[in-house]
Amino acid sequence: MPEQYRYTLPVKAGEQRLLGELTGAACATLVAEIAERHAGPVVLIAPDMQNALRLHDEISQFTDQMVMNLADWETLPYDSFSPHQDIISSRLSTLYQLPTMQRGVLIVPVNTLMQRVCPHSFLHGHALVMKKGQRLSRDALRTQLDSAGYRHVDQVMEHGEYATRGALLDLFPMGSELPYRLDFFDDEIDSLRVFDVDSQRTLEEVEAINLLPAHEFPTDKAAIELFRSQWRDTFEVKRDPEHIYQQVSKGTLPAGIEYWQPLFFSEPLPPLFSYFPANTLLVNTGDLETSAERFQADTLARFENRGVDPMRPLLPPQSLWLRVDELFSELKNWPRVQLKTEHLPTKAANANLGFQKLPDLAVQAQQKAPLDALRKFLETFDGPVVFSVESEGRREALGELLARIKIAPQRIMRLDEASDRGRYLMIGAAEHGFVDTVRNLALICESDLLGERVARRRQDSRRTINPDTLIRNLAELHIGQPVVHLEHGVGRYAGMTTLEAGGITGEYLMLTYANDAKLYVPVSSLHLISRYAGGAEENAPLHKLGGDAWSRARQKAAEKVRDVAAELLDIYAQRAAKEGFAFKHDREQYQLFCDSFPFETTPDQAQAINAVLSDMCQPLAMDRLVCGDVGFGKTEVAMRAAFLAVDNHKQVAVLVPTTLLAQQHYDNFRDRFANWPVRIEMISRFRSAKEQTQILAEVAEGKIDILIGTHKLLQSDVKFKDLGLLIVDEEHRFGVRHKERIKAMRANVDILTLTATPIPRTLNMAMSGMRDLSIIATPPARRLAVKTFVREYDSMVVREAILREILRGGQVYYLYNDVENIQKAAERLAELVPEARIAIGHGQMRERELERVMNDFHHQRFNVLVCTTIIETGIDIPTANTIIIERADHFGLAQLHQLRGRVGRSHHQAYAWLLTPHPKAMTTDAQKRLEAIASLEDLGAGFALATHDLEIRGAGELLGEEQSGSMETIGFSLYMELLENAVDALKAGREPSLEDLTSQQTEVELRMPSLLPDDFIPDVNTRLSFYKRIASAKTENELEEIKVELIDRFGLLPDPARTLLDIARLRQQAQKLGIRKLEGNEKGGVIEFAEKNHVNPAWLIGLLQKQPQHYRLDGPTRLKFIQDLSERKTRIEWVRQFMRELEENAIA
């Protein structure tokens, strides 16, 4: 820190300082410096949310003090939805800490500062601290949680939820990063542990936790009474059960209840200023007054527009927000510093700090000496120079760049470590640098050298989806759903039931078959059951118990599977035998190309890129599928592969399904390769015949490096001089003939296929190695999940949704999939929302006209596009963040997911409205589809969809058409299992036999209760999921894992659960030995061997001779044992010991 500062800080209330000449990251360095100087908290007021987020990242780079944001609700004033639970949690946590904040920076956007907040007394009065060893009755705690607004659920997933199971209580407190598990011993807290939401496993112990209320207002009985009486004083009461008053009276909180927050308190809501400690210093950047006035005008306009709904009468704006004049009179009560970029006139309260813009230092990739500008600046600047990069990965890239002009910067953590004429490097989020003329120091950020960098991904602490847990999981079975039993065929699930057989209670899965026949499957045999997935549920077959239709279908499928496996191996062998081209990787050129990518790559994206590059550098032909949700950056993977190909003087073909997409790829590729001597052309209906002929001639001569086009590229008159890479986008949109053409190219050209249609992981396992798969499941920077609503059509809902979007400067897709009446629909919208500028786009328009419409929409010349599903693939418009789909019940799930992916391509909250007719006018299937899509708000949910959407589009297509037939008869999961077994057998050089494929599963029956009691795991779906996992476990380790997880999540194992795991272990042993059946009872039991087994006959004969009173043969494959096993514990022990002896004497 320099000894003398260039400015003094205001101390008294109302005293102001204006500091000028702050450019680039100088604002952030200055706020950091103020935070270190000022003996109290600093509140930084930003003009809007975007600036607040950027400043948070930048300031954190320059100080070790705490830097916090007060989250904004991110809803419109008087909105009909509530903020996300995570936002409320973060706000409560910040508000709770604020009054006692000693030092540090709190950043608040103006409109959040204007919003009134809950009284401080409420937060402190309702916070509860729980410690290990504390005496606390569980019932009292549950009552307390209920009255604090926590929701009781079966499994804790979100903030504000709790679950109880026996002596355990799971709880996700507001303001906490992770949920906690409390273990009670009587009425004492025995242990407090943090656990992971996804796996539900505990992580570590803690001593105490702090419990904040679940909302920013009380929800206990007294508060609801107060709400009711204040409502009656303010508005009239409607009898309608949908009315806000009636809903709150019943104890349910309707969406958007936050805008009636004042009615829950007896005194008016205070401003945020009431939370600031007395020694707070305010700092503001940007034009406060304009931002505040704009916000006030918006609020007023919405109050007037929305105040007409008798079901939702509104409170006046002043009870929820400060007026602009109130805001400024509050500001006068505090010392305040204003930061300005311009030079200020000389006055006592003003100081100019002498920060100046850097000269233009951009790297000129196409020049001979790309780093000339930077080199000259460094030679002439005689103070320290600090380079700032965003991450370790970028640090290496910058290091390589600087090495070319012989500069090796030294790593520092703080700006004031820079001295003399040193060259330094620090990691942080600063966007633009500056020259500090007073300290004679220059800060150069990455974007000063490489052009605009766009926000890197703020690590979202929200959960990521683990696709494996979604697939083949029985946890979501509903009664009436089709399931496959390996031995009896496709039936319908009819629920779980407990039956008593021979005095032993067991839990069974009940299935119904044709003619109402029932089959009870013991839970130990759940490995024989899988969900039926292979087509629409209503088309699933229903087999007859004991009939031979199933065994015939299974036999046929197994034969088919064998052929498929052979075909796959054949393609693979051909690829392995044919030498592809091994590309050379010129790292320096490639790095320069990567540096001009304005986003930080996500971890999955980086993995996909590395996989593709290493495939291309192998002599084998590449065949890789990159699968990622819409807009997760698959195109960049393709561009880098194309760059490597062109750098090796090879040509690249990019094949896309539609002309619009071709145009978009063409524009993107042209932009991305703008600084490189690469020639890119496009072949599509937009080109005249003459242009096309010209292009084809140049392709054949090798003058064109990258050719983009629709299926025209596959015509026989397209000849490449030296094609090295074929990139196929959305392969499933091409017809069979086109696919055959692509298949023919496979063996000797590197092929990269991009798709957003999710392909289940299981498919990849079965194809192990046929086609390599990369999955991109992390969303790029600041993409929020798309909020999805399923609503009956209502013109007010439509008007609201369109206004919400256009008021924040965005655009709307209005999907109307009926070309005949699309004109009428557009006219109806124009009447409903006169503020909107509307255009129409559909597939039957003349191609050029459609192109013009899309282009205008892209350039924001109008803000509502009424269109058909033409927008389904790939058109990328970041400012379009609302999609409204009329008659959403007419779409398939995968299609709805694709369409929803058109929005939410920036860091604004995106909305998808699925409008439907009256529920009675929809099929149940359509209702289920809409429920499924609404439940999968998370980004990257494409994979989950593959399981929900049992249409599994990818499956039939990967292998050619006739496949999907056999898949429909036996179901997807079983089909995949058969295919996996067949591929393994063929790889090992064995001919796969049906026995091999539908291998006989061992039965173990010891006549003792073996189940997960429902008082141990009350939720039937969770129980079912565990049964399936136990039955399907292949190794002892897997069972051990499951056991640890059960104890961890539900407490000590009851005896029947222990027995269930023991029997599963015995089944694994018996299966390995080739034992078909193992029965035990009080007097002994029977072991039945399969024809092919690993039991040593000599050892067995010896046993029969030595102990004839205990063992005897009963037919050629049955061994009887006579033993007193009336004690259940000894029964398991004895059988386990006998199995061990069999294992020790097994033969190969």
From Swiss-Prot:
One Gene Ontology CC term in the entry: cytosol
Top-level taxonomic group: Bacteria
Binding site for ATP: G628, D629, V630, G631, F632, G633, K634, T635
Protein location: Cytoplasm
SUPFAM superfamilies named in the record: CarD-like (SSF141259), P-loop containing nucleoside triphosphate hydrolases (SSF52540), TRCF domain-like (SSF143517)
InterPro entries per the UniProt record, alphabetical: CarD-like/TRCF_RID, CarD-like/TRCF_RID_sf, DEAD/DEAH_box_helicase_dom, Helicase_ATP-bd, Helicase_C-like, Mfd, MFD_D3, P-loop_NTPase
GO terms for biological process, alphabetical: DNA damage response; DNA repair; nucleotide-excision repair, preincision complex assembly; regulation of DNA-templated transcription; transcription-coupled nucleotide-excision repair; transcription-coupled nucleotide-excision repair, DNA damage recognition
Motif (DEEH box) on chain: 729-732
GO molecular function annotation: ATP binding; damaged DNA binding; DNA binding; DNA translocase activity; hydrolase activity; RNA polymerase core enzyme binding
Annotated Helicase ATP-binding domain residues: 615-776
EC code(s) of this entry: 3.6.4.-
Transmembrane segments: none
Helicase C-terminal domain sequence ranges: 798-951
Alphabetic keyword roster: ATP-binding, Cytoplasm, DNA damage, DNA repair, DNA-binding, Helicase, Hydrolase, Nucleotide-binding
Function: Couples transcription and DNA repair by recognizing RNA polymerase (RNAP) stalled at DNA lesions. Mediates ATP-dependent release of RNAP and its truncated transcript from the DNA, and recruitment of nucleotide excision repair machinery to the damaged site. Can also dissociate RNAP that is blocked by low concentration of nucleoside triphosphates or by physical obstruction, such as bound proteins. In addition, can rescue arrested complexes by promoting forward translocation. Has ATPase activity, which is required for removal of stalled RNAP, but seems to lack helicase activity.
Quaternary structure and partners: Monomer. Interacts with UvrA and RNAP.
Alphabetical list of HAMAP family matching this protein: TRCF
Comment, domains: Consists of a compact arrangement of structured domains linked by long, flexible linkers. The N-terminal region interacts with UvrA, the central region interacts with RNAP, and the C-terminal DNA translocase region possesses ATPase activity. Activity is regulated by a conformational switch from a dormant closed state to an active open state upon substrate binding.
NCBIfam families: mfd (TIGR00580), PRK10689.1 (NF007966)
Family assignment from sequence similarity: In the N-terminal section; belongs to the UvrB family. In the C-terminal section; belongs to the helicase family. RecG subfamily.
Protein name: Transcription-repair-coupling factor
